[in-house]
């Protein structure tokens, strides 16, 4: 699904915006794909195990694994997403150069799609596919594609690459919501959402701590590393307390 939306974004950017905007988007997209690959790998590893549990009718154990997976993936997803948002102002010009400073906004927007894609990954890889609910999965992807197409058509002409990034976030949100609705009568989605609220709050506190530093930070590697260490420390301490 992510590949579909990013491909759509690139095609529409090429047709409706400039080469510079395309470059900003592609650079930002690579970072997001790299950062979120651990979430994709987690889902791929867990799918055979969940398929075996469902085929054996072991619902209690499958629910336990899903709860553990949701907690683990969402802890990682919020740390990555809000961590990227926190340091993007320094990261973009340091990593790519001053000409790519606008990537900070695009990178931040794309990062917000990670929690949605992470939660949807658990539902898809550990419930929909193991239970043969391919139709619900395909429908969610179609709805996401339509949402992305609509959002891009409205936003890219006005906002360029940032508009495409926002369209991707909207699409991932729609996919996540559609998959949750597909399984709401079978599993307690609300309980999973409540358990992830803590990680969202921890991520926001991490973001707040880094933003305090960022107000006086210079665009140097040392300041970037300091922000990463402070943000990571705040998040890890809160996670341990949880």
PLM regions with names:
Residues 144-147, 194-242:
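Transmembrane alpha-helical segments of multi-pass transport proteins
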Residues 14, 51, 128-129, 156, ...:
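Helix-capping/transition residues at the boundaries of transmembrane alpha-helices
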Residues 11, 15, 38-41, 81-89, ...:
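Membrane-embedded alpha-helical segments of multi-pass transporters/permeases
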Residues 17-18, 55, 96, 133, ...:
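A helix-boundary/kink motif common to multi-pass secondary transporters
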Residues 2, 6, 40-44, 105-132, ...:
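Short runs within selected transmembrane alpha-helices of multi-pass transporters and secretion channels
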Residues 1-19:
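Signature of the first transmembrane helix
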Residues 24-142:
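Specific pore-lining/lateral-gate transmembrane helices of multi-pass inner-membrane transport
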Residues 10, 22, 136-138, 164-165, ...:
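Alpha-helical transmembrane segments and their helix-entry boundary regions
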């Amino acid at each position: 699904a992510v590949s579909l939306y990013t491909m759509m974004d690139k095609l529409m950017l090429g047709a409706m915006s400039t080469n510079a905007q395309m470059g900003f988007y592609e650079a930002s997209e690579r970072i997001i794909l790299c950062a979120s690959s651990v979430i994709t790998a987690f889902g791929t590893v867990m799918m055979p195990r969940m398929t075996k549990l469902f085929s054996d009718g072991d619902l209690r154990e499958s629910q336990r694994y899903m709860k553990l997976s949701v907690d683990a993936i969402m802890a990682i997803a919020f740390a990555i997403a809000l961590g990227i948002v926190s340091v993007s102002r320094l990261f973009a010009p340091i990593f790519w150069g001053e000409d790519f400073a606008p990537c900070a906004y695009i990178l931040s927007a794309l990062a917000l799609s990670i929690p949605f894609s992470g939660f949807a990954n658990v539902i898809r890889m550990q419930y929909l596919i193991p239970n043969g609910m391919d139709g619900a999965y395909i429908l969610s992807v179609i709805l996401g594609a339509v949402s992305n197409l609509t959002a891009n058509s409205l936003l890219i002409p006005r906002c360029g690459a940032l508009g495409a990034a926002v369209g991707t976030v909207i699409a991932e949100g729609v996919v996540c919501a559609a998959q949750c609705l597909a399984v709401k009568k079978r599993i307690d989605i609300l309980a999973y959402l409540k358990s992830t609220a803590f990680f969202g709050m921890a991520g926001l506190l991490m973001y707040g701590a880094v933003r305090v530093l960022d107000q006086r930070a210079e665009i140097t590697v040392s300041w970037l590393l300091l922000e990463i260490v402070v943000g990571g420390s705040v998040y890890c301490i809160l996670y341990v307390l949880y």
